Amino acid sequence: MSKKDVIELEGTIVEALPNAMFKVELENGHTILGHISGKMRMNYIKILPGDGVTVQISPYDLSRGRIVYRKKN
């Protein structure tokens, strides 16, 4: 799957789960399961409930996504 096939959406972290997984509430009201991307792990970027994030979702499984960016605020 290439980068142009992914869907990027904005959301807010609702809950932190084990194994670096998070429940993310998207702007459209849906709640998905998200994991941290490898670059965010390498740079030790911490994510807490309430943070605004950008999530990439595969068109094949719309219930899971990859957290690729944490907003500044």
UniProtKB/Swiss-Prot annotation:
SUPFAM superfamilies reported in the protein's UniProt record: Nucleic acid-binding proteins
Molecular function per GO: ribosome binding; rRNA binding; translation initiation factor activity
Stretch forming the signal peptide: none
Keywords: Cytoplasm, Initiation factor, Protein biosynthesis, RNA-binding, rRNA-binding
InterPro entries, per database record: NA-bd_OB-fold (IPR012340), RNA-binding_domain_S1_IF1 (IPR006196), S1_domain (IPR003029), TIF_IF1 (IPR004368)
Database matches in CDD domains: S1_IF1
Entry annotated with the keyword RNA-binding: yes
Residues of the S1-like domain: 1-72
Location of this chain's protein in the cell: Cytoplasm
Gene Ontology cellular-component terms listed: cytosol
Family indicated by similarity: Belongs to the IF-1 family.
Subunit structure: Component of the 30S ribosomal translation pre-initiation complex which assembles on the 30S ribosome in the order IF-2 and IF-3, IF-1 and N-formylmethionyl-tRNA(fMet); mRNA recruitment can occur at any time during PIC assembly.
Function: One of the essential components for the initiation of protein synthesis. Stabilizes the binding of IF-2 and IF-3 on the 30S subunit to which N-formylmethionyl-tRNA(fMet) subsequently binds. Helps modulate mRNA selection, yielding the 30S pre-initiation complex (PIC). Upon addition of the 50S ribosomal subunit IF-1, IF-2 and IF-3 are released leaving the mature 70S translation initiation complex.
Name of the protein in its database record: Translation initiation factor IF-1
Gene that this sequence comes from: infA
